[in-house]
């Protein structure tokens, strides 16, 4: 059974998504990040409002939560999003190490509304050079120097 507080935070994420659509400012996505029963951050999709293809509700809420908490890990936080996260947001969620994610609609629901991520998942499975946007590896040896120096750096902050 889902706790009432989870429903409250999810209802807010859904409300944010509706407000965003009704205002004409962006897509139907809202997100809330909570910790210990309190909202830490909330956001809506701002892709078209900011001309930033990475301005998804989840990414923006993660950025805000990290700034407010002064850390880059959100291990004790919950994320509530009006829709199942896209591949980019899923990556951000894992990098932020959130405790748990609650989502409303499915990726298939988003696809029906024109937000179809299936092509991205298919692209990830392709070899680099065969992707729609070909990815060509060059200068690996030179690029590895930064990793070698990182590994040798005392006092680094791993993440």
Regions found by a protein language model. Name each.
Residues 25-29, 73:
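Short, basic and Ser/Thr-rich N-terminal targeting/leader segments
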Residues 1-22, 85, 92-159:
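Zinc-dependent deaminase
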Residues 54-55, 59-96:
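Helix-adjacent hinge/juxtasegments
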């Amino acid at each position: 059974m889902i706790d009432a507080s989870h429903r409250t935070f999810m209802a807010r994420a859904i409300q944010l998504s509706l407000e965003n659509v009704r205002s004409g400012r962006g897509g139907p996505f809202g997100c809330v990040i909570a910790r210990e029963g309190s909202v830490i951050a909330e956001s809506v999709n701002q892709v078209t409002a900011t001309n930033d293809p990475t301005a998804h509700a989840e990414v923006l809420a993660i950025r805000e939560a990290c700034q407010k908490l002064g850390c880059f890990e959100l291990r004790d936080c919950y994320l509530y999003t009006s829709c199942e996260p896209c591949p980019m947001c899923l990556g951000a969620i894992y990098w932020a190490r959130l405790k748990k994610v609650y989502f409303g609609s499915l990726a298939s629901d988003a696809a029906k509304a024109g937000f179809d991520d299936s092509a991205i998942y298919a692209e990830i499975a392709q070899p680099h050079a065969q992707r729609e946007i070909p990815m060509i590896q060059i200068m690996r040896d030179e690029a590895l120097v930064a990793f070698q120096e990182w590994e040798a750096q005392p006092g680094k902050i791993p993440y």
